[in-house]
């Protein structure tokens, strides 16, 4: 599938007196084409894993201490990616061992400890870290030989580059279009298997969407939990809809999409991550809506149902640009676009008491979903999911992601779990006695 060429606005001509002015063309934002460069490394909180290092060594599974036996985790990876040949998809498994050292799982099932560095300049790991998968329709099995903390299982159509730097591991970056791995279609699931809490896995779309993944966890009693992920055509579908939204309102929704060097869609960034690369993006997108919200609740109260001990909390602005809520020891100034899409800055940085902690997720979710001015929106949360994303402005990235979720699981922004009935939209799967982690690549198995 080919990405959209940069969209162009229609030429406009108008009369000034008796003179026809020259046509004026206005280019609308389009997808970002990646330009991978070896050694172009940008370190962000999203692609950096803090950890120690042991040096260049490999620990075979049979050499691990006997206490590690309970930390083993069998994994199967099912290749559903249409047309993929044997060896075209690679898995990369990495994280920290129980001492905090950076470690990878190699294709032979051993732990590999990459050599560390005291340099602030990232050094690419030269070891072959890839675990090649079979062709479409096959299942690849392996076992993680010991506990793994703060881990990720990457799947990639091609090869990924990893780097060591003073303080830890640098992983591929979705936000850097010049990243060495930028032209590779990849994604990951989060994974922690600890001796105290057992297995935690997660699929999230808070930052971006890339290679389509799903998963299930089987416990020793036979119980199976699933997070099926997105439809196989999700990236194409979402980018098509984002391009249409840009054509409609002029905002850079289409630029959330990245294409490879041939023009095919690769991934979709969340608006929050896109703003981290272009601070002016969406700067006035919410301005009018925010003014209406703060005006509406000048005297008529906004009620936040904390769904916990604080109960219902009443908030008003009193006609100012500050929202004040009963029981909260902080106030809520008018947010910026970055505050709304990220839910962790400005008025949505949780710095207050338990009431503040309960208000922030519900208020930020209401902004993203565009429900604050709807009938019944004076109580948050109270409206059903059918009311989410029905008015503009809203978080269209989140809207289109949810339209492509097979089973409704997976956050598209930080507080996507806020619902009046407590419905769980999380892509997290947990087990204290997991016997198998199964991952699907390219869409769920039929």
Positions of PLM-derived features:
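Fungal secretory targeting signals
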Residues: 1-35
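Extracellular low-complexity, O-glycosylation-prone Ser/Thr/Pro/Gly-rich "stalks"
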Residues: 22-446
